[in-house]
Amino acid sequence: MVPVLIKDLLSSKPEGQQVKVCGWVRSVRDSKGLVFIQVNDGSCFSNIQLTFDRNNPSNNANVNNIEETLKKLNTGASVRAIGALIESPASGQAVEVTLEDIECLGTCNPEEYPLQKNKMSMEYLRENAHLRARTNTFGAVYRVRNQMAFAVHSFFQERGFQYMNAPEITCSDCEG
């Protein structure tokens, strides 16, 4: 099964079809037998919510694997999840994925990657440049830059131009 981008899931009609989602965990909440995992893949600003009901798991759920994986999950972990896309019963999002299986592809050490659930200041991101790509602000900037570069390249390609990366030729003529 091919993973589906979160931006495509959020704009689709929920019909209970099985989907595969890959991305980074933004938050994990466990409350009274219900587990909520917010996942983002960078394709859009919004997250998709993965849900798991410990008291009433779906018939296809790999319960033991889900429980083991949930112990490893924290903010920043990368996951691959399979589940049914359904209309969300709660307000806040139109659709959600009920977990049938989940795999932790990589954990995130909070000491090496001090990702915060709340918004990180620009000063904090300046000091921790490796975290920029995981923020909504920089993700939006990267998506805009991608669209702009694509438009410029398309414009020139349609007019017969070719793109080339010229090598940098530099010389060092230092004084003193």
Predicted ranges, named:
Residues 1-176:
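Class II aminoacyl-tRNA synthetase catalytic cores and aaRS-like
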